[in-house]
């Protein structure tokens, strides 16, 4: 078992996080608000297409 797999399993046990990004499968940095379940990187790429607006 590699270190990255072990870290992912340990993170799931520690946080109770069972979801993964629906786009790329990443387990960390998830945006779960509104049941989106995208990692933060994927969310940044598709947020405008989903109707989110960026305010500065």
UniProtKB/Swiss-Prot annotation:
It comes from Natronomonas pharaonis (strain ATCC 35678 / DSM 2160 / CIP 103997 / JCM 8858 / NBRC 14720 / NCIMB 2260 / Gabara). This is Small ribosomal subunit protein uS14A. Its cofactor is Zn(2+). The keyword Nucleus does not apply. Part of the 30S ribosomal subunit. Binds 16S rRNA, required for the assembly of 30S particles. GO terms for biological process: cytoplasmic translation. PROSITE patterns: RIBOSOMAL_S14 (PS00527). Binds 1 zinc ion per subunit. One of its GO terms (cellular component) is cytosolic small ribosomal subunit. HAMAP family: Ribosomal_uS14_2_A (MF_01364_A). One of its GO terms (molecular function) is rRNA binding. Disulfide bonds: none annotated. Keywords: Metal-binding, Ribonucleoprotein, Ribosomal protein, RNA-binding, rRNA-binding, Zinc.
């Amino acid at each position: 078992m590699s270190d990255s797999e072990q870290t992912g399993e340990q993170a799931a046990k520690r946080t109770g996080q069972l979801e993964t990004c629906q786009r790329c499968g990443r387990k960390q940095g998830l945006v779960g608000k509104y049941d989106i379940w995208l990692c933060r990187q994927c969310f940044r790429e598709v947020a405008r297409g989903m109707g989110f607006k960026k305010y500065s």
